[in-house]
């Protein structure tokens, strides 16, 4: 029987706060690191820097709206759609793989992250979930940027470096997946709400970028 999702997430967070880098690296069921993993680590580091810079710029530019982590309502757009936290569990918590494979996902990849071709199922599942996260955020950011570009004030729009960093890591992972197109809104955009949404999305994405970077670091050092 799978443990309750809430209890599992709490357990993961407690473990993350106590496990050091090497412990996690030894626990993760992976093959020996390949040059592809090192390349993906570089991409994940670039992504983390890019989203951090974009968030900092947004907080400075949008100083008249709530844009700090204490002020915003935190939202995870991947909730109930992907399972990255569970899929990237360390070995000691991976007691039942069926608990982590509750969704149908494509595990076919030509990406350089798995260039060795001998990665474990759990590693592939983890990287596939990361790929799906990135695709969702990419779609959200592109839709949001299109709205921001319509703002007569032209106050802020997304840094191309961040969008490029997302695309580069997606290409390195290169999983086959079905992208569900977003429906275009016929409503007149509310630019104030869009900017608040931007702050919320950037905070959430930075947290996910930290998780992705740590995951790639563990894979590279294991």
UniProtKB/Swiss-Prot annotation:
GO terms (BP aspect): immune response; interleukin-12-mediated signaling pathway
Domain of life per record: Eukaryota
Compartments in which it is found: Secreted
UniProt signal peptide: 1-25
Classification via Pfam families: IL12
GO (cellular component) term, any one: interleukin-12 complex
Disulfide bonds: 40-113, 67-199, 88-126
InterPro entries reported for this sequence: 4_helix_cytokine-like_core, IL-12, IL-12_alpha
Glycosylation sites: 42, 96, 110
Molecular function GO terms recorded: cytokine activity; growth factor activity; interleukin-12 receptor binding
Family: Belongs to the IL-6 superfamily.
Function: Heterodimerizes with IL12B to form the IL-12 cytokine or with EBI3/IL27B to form the IL-35 cytokine. IL-12 is primarily produced by professional antigen-presenting cells (APCs) such as B-cells and dendritic cells (DCs) as well as macrophages and granulocytes and regulates T-cell and natural killer-cell responses, induces the production of interferon-gamma (IFN-gamma), favors the differentiation of T-helper 1 (Th1) cells and is an important link between innate resistance and adaptive immunity.
Subunit architecture: Heterodimer with IL12B; disulfide-linked. This heterodimer is known as interleukin IL-12. Heterodimer with EBI3/IL27B; not disulfide-linked. This heterodimer is known as interleukin IL-35. Interacts with NBR1; this interaction promotes IL-12 secretion.
Protein name from the UniProt record: Interleukin-12 subunit alpha
Source organism of the structure: Canis lupus familiaris
């Amino acid at each position: 029987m799978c443990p309750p999702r809430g209890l599992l997430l709490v357990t993961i967070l407690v473990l993350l706060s106590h496990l050091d880098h090497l412990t996690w690296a030894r626990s993760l069921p992976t093959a020996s690191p390949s040059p592809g993993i090192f390349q993906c680590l570089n991409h994940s580091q670039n992504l983390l820097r890019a989203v951090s810079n974009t968030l900092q710029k947004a907080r400075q530019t949008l100083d008249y709206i709530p844009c700090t982590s204490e002020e915003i309502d935190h939202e995870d757009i991947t909730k109930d759609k992907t399972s990255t936290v569970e899929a990237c569990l360390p070995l000691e918590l991976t007691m039942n793989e069926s608990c982590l494979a509750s969704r149908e996902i494509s595990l076919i990849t030509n990406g350089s992250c798995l260039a060795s071709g001998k990665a474990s199922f759990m590693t592939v599942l983890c990287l596939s979930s990361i790929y799906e996260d990135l695709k969702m955020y990419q779609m959200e950011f592109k839709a949001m940027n299109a709205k921001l570009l319509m703002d007569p004030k032209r106050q802020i729009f997304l840094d191309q470096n961040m969008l490029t960093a997302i695309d580069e890591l997606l290409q390195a992972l290169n999983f086959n997946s079905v992208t569900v197109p977003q429906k275009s809104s016929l409503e007149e955009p509310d630019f104030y709400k869009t900017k608040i949404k931007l702050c919320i999305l950037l905070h959430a994405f930075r947290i996910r970028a930290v998780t992705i970077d740590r995951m790639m670091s563990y894979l590279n050092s294991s």
